[in-house]
Amino acid sequence: ADAPAGFTLCKACHSVEAGKNGVGPSLAGVYGRKAGTISGFKFSDPHIKSGLTWDEPTLTKYLADPKTVIPGNKMVFAGLKNPDDVKAVIEYLKTLK
């Protein structure tokens, strides 16, 4: 699947290839995964201790306002303000294996 326009900002820091971490962790297989568990990436303590799973409700909130969902996380992105972009990015993340 082609990445939606809303994903442009994500790919500045995130790869979609398994095992290829950048400034942020690879997003391959992220949908359904527990937050802070990908190997080879140094997550912030708040991220690791969040206990979140990247499902649709969690991603919907996180992509719109990451700092409220996980206060103190390292991601500098302020969030996607358009709900349609959030939905499109989540649908795209579901396709990444």
Swiss-Prot record:
Question: Could you mention a single GO BP entry for this protein?
Answer: photosynthesis
Post-translational changes noted in the entry: Binds 1 heme c group covalently per subunit.
Question: What keywords appear on the UniProt entry?
Answer: Electron transport, Heme, Iron, Metal-binding, Photosynthesis, Transport
InterPro entries in alphabetical order: Cyt_c-like_dom, Cyt_c-like_dom_sf, Cyt_c_1A/1B
Q: Which residues bind heme c?
A: C10, C13, H14, M75
Asked if the Swiss-Prot or TrEMBL record annotates the protein with the keyword Kinase, the reply is no
UniProt-listed PROSITE patterns: CYTC
List the molecular function annotations (GO) for this entry. electron transfer activity; heme binding; metal ion binding
Function description: Cytochrome c2 is found mainly in purple, non-sulfur, photosynthetic bacteria where it functions as the electron donor to the oxidized bacteriochlorophyll in the photophosphorylation pathway. However, it may also have a role in the respiratory chain and is found in some non-photosynthetic bacteria.
The UniProt family comment states: Belongs to the cytochrome c family.
Q: What's the protein called, per UniProt?
A: Cytochrome c2 iso-2
Q: Which organism is the protein's source?
A: Magnetospirillum molischianum
